[in-house]
Amino acid sequence: MSHEEDLIDYSDEELQTTDAAATTAAPASNGEAKKGDLTVSGGRPDKKGSYVGIHSTGFRDFLLKEELLRAITDCGFEHPSEVQQVCIPTAILNVDVLCQAKSGLGKTAVFVLTTLHQLEPVPGECSILVMCHTRELAYQIKNEYARFSKYLPDVKTAVFYGGTPIQKDVELLSNKESYPNIVVGTPGRLNALVRDKKLSLRNVKAFVLDECDKMLDQIDMRRDVQEIFRATPADKQVMMFSATLSQEIRPVCKKFMRNPLEVYVDDDTKLTLHGLQQYYIKLSEAEKNRKLNELLDSLEFNQVIIFVKSTLRANELDKLLRECNFPSIAVHSGVSQEERIKRYKEFKEFNKRICVATDVFGRGIDIERINLAINYDLPADADSYLHRVGRAGRFGTKGLSISFVSTEDDEKVLKDIEKRFEVALPEYPEGGVDSSTYMA
């Protein structure tokens, strides 16, 4: 499978595993409903029920297991988000789901709660498989499963990703007592475990891709995903989620599914983040450090994430900040896996307030206290910008993002962002910003 076309298109025989219901499935536009900026379609095969008529004001309305409701209460969640209201009632009926919703709207909880509700754990069997594209995100998802399964003592969850000795994974999987019912991981490591027959997927009931566009866009990662997919049963439930799902990638996602419920929260061109104030500052490369120091001195914030374009710049900026007595840490692919997780936990647990990161932290990472995101280096495209600034203002809370614009390329990206999301980003005011407008 060396050509891209081979990775996108299955043969007729392979399609039988995902399109068994093609003759009876409705076209994607069938039953489309639109309310405000929410578009819902499909996902209503006979005898499977649907979300129609269900508008929940509380998680109890979803009729979830009592143990899950207790865990939800412990987490302090009262009302489901819009995406949770639409997806969960249908997803728990075993319907496939393709969902695009902005950062911070609770997509992770959709598949975590759905799969835990459906799960009947069998010792020594993996029933739920969740894949994502970075180790940090895998680690975070595993923690979400731990959080919501606290009253389900028989449920075992494990996370597998590269950068750590595979022998530890093999040992865990060779012991029936520790064998996980829920597996979370990155495609490369999971594929190695499946190929070596250390991880059996023959009992998988739910197959989940988080940040699915990132995995299916990259040829090598897509190849791993497809190989793993073929090792699972044909009649499983498939769910895919991302903050950005282009028109081009949606058909690729749907090749893995049968008549999915399609949920697109906000039109693709209007993926702005409510509650997040966004500004830019024009300056030269040489002025960046001084301006960053000024901002960190003058702005109020709980936690800040500062994005740079390379591991070298992350290390240099982190060192500079610490020399200026700013308590920062750096997270990027050049740091060992063990150290990355340690630093992630330090930041997550509020032991550090400033994090300098590359795009390894740009997607999916959910740290609720971040309310300031600074693009020290502007990203290469509009989608990456959305994912980065989405780290501030999670779940509809207030936040502030500031982007440094210093080159012609930066100006082009800024124009692309404004065009793509139909917004006009204002220049950062000389007098600064009133903290009450972005501090929750």
From Swiss-Prot:
Gene3D superfamilies: P-loop containing nucleotide triphosphate hydrolases (3.40.50.300). A motif (DEAD box) lies at residues 210-213. The keyword rRNA processing does not apply. Residues 88-263 form the Helicase ATP-binding domain. Residues 17-28 have a biased composition (Low complexity). SUPFAM superfamilies: P-loop containing nucleoside triphosphate hydrolases. It comes from the Eukaryota. ATP binds at A101, K102, S103, G104, L105, G106, K107, T108. One of its GO terms (cellular component) is transcription export complex. Its EC number is 3.6.4.13. Its main location: nucleus. Residues 1-42 are annotated as: Disordered. Signal peptide: none annotated. Transmembrane segments: none annotated. Residues 291-436 form the Helicase C-terminal domain. PROSITE patterns: HELICASE_ATP_BIND_1 (PS51192), HELICASE_CTER (PS51194), Q_MOTIF (PS51195). Keywords: ATP-binding, Helicase, Hydrolase, mRNA processing, mRNA splicing, mRNA transport, Nucleotide-binding, Nucleus, RNA-binding, Spliceosome, Transport. It catalyses: ATP + H2O = ADP + phosphate + H(+). It is found in: Nucleus. One of its GO terms (biological process) is mRNA splicing, via spliceosome. It is an enzyme of class 3 (hydrolase). The Q motif is unique to and characteristic of the DEAD box family of RNA helicases and controls ATP binding and hydrolysis. Belongs to the DEAD box helicase family. DECD subfamily. ATP-binding RNA helicase involved in transcription elongation and required for the export of mRNA out of the nucleus. SUB2 also plays a role in pre-mRNA splicing and spliceosome assembly. May be involved in rDNA and telomeric silencing, and maintenance of genome integrity. This is ATP-dependent RNA helicase sub2. It comes from Aspergillus niger (strain ATCC MYA-4892 / CBS 513.88 / FGSC A1513). The lineage of its organism: Eukaryota, Fungi, Dikarya, Ascomycota, Pezizomycotina. The gene is sub2.
